[in-house]
Amino acid sequence: MKKIKKLIIACDGEAASGKSTGAKLLSKKYNLLLINSGLFYRYSSKKIIEKKPKNIINFLKKELNSISYKKISKQKLHSEAISNHVAVLAKNKKVRQIINQLQMKIIKANKRICVEGRDIASKILVKNPKYDVAFYFKCDLKVAAYRRWLDLKKSVSLKEVKKSLSLRTKI
């Protein structure tokens, strides 16, 4: 079978719906670079929580410009505090623009890539470059809450996780 030279796969969907699992399987099967766009928001939230900058826009421009995706992906970014902060941060239009520009830079630099994240197919990879294949993941709230609760190693109650996901799904 001939290897496809250019392939952009987008895995979009709701919080805790299985996007990451699906994207990992696809990137492994087709030997693609895997980018989890949510990690940019999680990393940004972690740094904002730690450093408490006065101007988050300038802070994030500098912070995200000076770190590689590889380093971001190795951080511990799945805590309830970070998840709750991401829900607020993701509503900031300027923050989304900064993170989207960074994602586009990475995507344009790689011909074979699988990008996973909310709005990646519906708003981000709609042109230049546009995805070749897109998947949308949807999951029942009870199942999504249980999946996230397991990810959090049961450190918070299932009820709290369900409430948090319910709020995040509305973003």
Predicted regions and their residues:
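Phosphate-binding P-loop
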Residues: 1-6
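ATP-binding Walker
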Residues: 14-17
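Post-Walker A helix-loop "phosphate-sensing" segment adjacent to the P-loop in P-loop NTPases
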Residues: 27-37, 50-53
